């Protein structure tokens, strides 16, 4: 039995489409749990009526990490699957046997705590994998260095082409938009850190898995399309979304990478100013 968790936030049509059109292609016996963030029981039941093949859980909107954890805990209590697919609802399969292949890869690489496919955006570019990047590189020097570095030097300095060059194997960070986790490893690692709201979960998961000796494995033999930001883009502007990302990543840098609160506050002030003139 495979577990599948979808965190849905006011995007019923996307969720219904994904369950009926994409997950219907999965040949492995599976149980789908939809965590309906921001819905009460009555509103969640309306969604459940449209996808009777799924379990729909109403939930307070405490973010992506908490929503996924809720779905995973339900699966652990009811089915105890060996693997759980954590997926957005704005995903389209671009290969045959996507999920089946990821499960096979996970089984053949027992060191992997999570396995991800090639994920491309609407522009055709890969969304990961990514290397580690420091707080200041990610949010300050990346932008302030532009007048001083040519395109080629900037590409090398910040490894901007890392996703396009990435080959099959272990990498620091994989996208959480479509990620197969080893249920036991995910549980032992402490699942996602619920202090984050949106963004930063994958970085923290990478560190948590590393602490128990597990890795993230990239399998580009199968591909999915991620219509990135289709949901959040309807509810938040670009600057608001960027600062939301920073605040979640601040949790990662503060508690997992040892940055001081003062350093993070200074970086946020500079980053906020940069966003105003971008």
Residue positions per predicted region:
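Short, well-formed alpha-helical segments that are part of the catalytic scaffolds
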Residues: 11-26
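A conserved acidic beta->alpha catalytic loop
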Residues: 12, 34-45
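Glycine-rich, basic loop-to-helix element that forms the pyrophosphate-binding segment
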Residues: 58-78
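Short beta-strand-to-loop acidic/aromatic patch adjacent to the donor-nucleotide binding site
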Residues: 80-92
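Conserved donor NDP-sugar-binding/catalytic core segment of glycosyltransferases
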Residues: 92-129
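Short, flexible, basic/aromatic active-site loop/helix in glycosyltransferases
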Residues: 134-171
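A short, conserved alpha-helix in the catalytic core of glycosyltransferases
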Residues: 164-166, 172-223
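Active-site-adjacent helix/loop segment of glycosyltransferases
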Residues: 206-278
